[in-house]
Amino acid sequence: MTPEEEAHFRVLQAIAREPDITQRELAEQLGLSLGKTNFLINALLEKGAIKMESFRRSDTKLKKIAYLLTPSGISERVRLAQGYLIRKRLEYENLKAEIDALERDSIVASIQSGESKV
């Protein structure tokens, strides 16, 4: 999964959870700049993965925008999720192996120094 695909996946995930999220809220949630978030939204709109709908909230007179996943956006999200899961599982296994090695080294060092921290 490329960094761009991961960014698209994270945007699609956020929109699926909260369609009426603003770009500013999305940027904060994903830790991205507002400009980068706008770029990602526009790329997903161009790909046909999402569409925009405007509506009025009953408690205000302001128009709001909702981002909705299209059928191709849902398929894209599923495809990207599979790659994301594979990568995250691999990262988890590597991290777990590193933690296990550090714990073994720590136990060996404790035994060698005469401490018993087990």
Language-model region placement:
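Amphipathic alpha-helical dimerization/coiled-coil segments
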Residues: 75-118
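Pre-recognition alpha-helix immediately N-terminal to the DNA-recognition helix
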Residues: 9-13
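Alpha-helical residues within the helix-turn-helix
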Residues: 28, 45-46
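Short, cationic-aromatic polyanion-contact patches
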Residues: 1-8, 22, 55-78
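Key DNA-contact positions within bacterial/archaeal DNA-binding proteins
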Residues: 24, 35
